[in-house]
């Protein structure tokens, strides 16, 4: 898979030009980075989801933060759009950065749990999607 960060584009512009199918959230709480583990996986990843038909990216972001993670207070901001190519298909996503200030009860979702780390995992074997998530993480916290 190949990740391409798309620069110089606003959130409203990207939503008008391409069909966004995924959102990814690089989150921090109490100066620690948030990662999640999916059921059945022993690796970590950035929180994210597919944008379902009829849903806009703002609703998908809220679904991730509130519905999947149990976040009750946050400040989220658009970072950039990105594309992921698997050799034949291209999918577009939006990267957000979120400052989490309050958490509620962890909902029953497809996640095993939420993990807070001082630094991102160094070893690629600890990431579910090292070819994309590591670069998205770096982009989110570079700015």
Model-derived regions: residue spans:
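A short coil-to-beta-strand element that immediately follows conserved catalytic motifs
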Residues: 71-80
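A generic fold-level signal
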Residues: 18-20, 28, 88-91, 109
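Nudix hydrolase/Nudix homology domain
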Residues: 107-143
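Short loop segments at secondary-structure junctions
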Residues: 30-32, 99-104, 119-120
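Acidic, metal-coordinating catalytic segment for phosphate/diphosphate chemistry
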Residues: 1-24
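Conserved Nudix-box catalytic region and its N-terminal flanking loop in Nudix hydrolases
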Residues: 28-68
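Short helix-capping/turn motifs at alpha-helix boundaries
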Residues: 81, 94-97, 124-131
